[in-house]
Amino acid sequence: MDEYKHIETCVGRYIAAQYLHAVEVGIGRNPDAARIVSDAGKLLCSTDVRQMPVPEDITFFVDDVFSPDISRYRKADVIYAIRPAIEMIPPMIELAQKVDCDLVVCHLGFESWGDGGEKIDCGVILHRYYRGQNPSNRVD
């Protein structure tokens, strides 16, 4: 399996198995993880700072985590991102805290922010930087 697609597959399967209402931040031009989560019926939406060519059946919004539209994230039990720029981590943590949901990040290589958060091995290493305090919507 192509390593690039392996990462998205692992992340998508993990998010779909562990959560009910997910938002992907920074979808870019790679909707593979969002596709897996969406096919499981668990993707609320995907976002990026610019308009992106995502499949029509994946709900997409232009949004910037540095000044997010909180309404896009309110129902989420997880916000996740694949290979975000490291400077995006603090505002994503703040966003997850505001809406009280988990924040799960798959970094590029061995990057991490701060203490690296809670590490999760789902075939690739994920970092849970914030765990929502009201897990009523969480599968696990």
Q: PLM features: what roles do these ranges have?
A:
Residues 1-19:
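S-adenosyl-L-methionine
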Residues 43-48:
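Conserved SAM-binding motif I beta-strand of class I
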Residues 29-40:
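Conserved SAM-binding loop of SAM-dependent methyltransferases across substrates and taxa
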Residues 87-140:
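C-terminal substrate-binding/active-site "lid" region of AdoMet-derived donor-dependent transferases
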Residues 19-29:
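Conserved class I S-adenosyl-L-methionine
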Residues 70-78:
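A short acidic, Gly/Pro-enriched loop at the edge of an enzyme's catalytic core
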Residues 56-68:
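Conserved SAM-binding strand-loop segment of SAM-dependent methyltransferases
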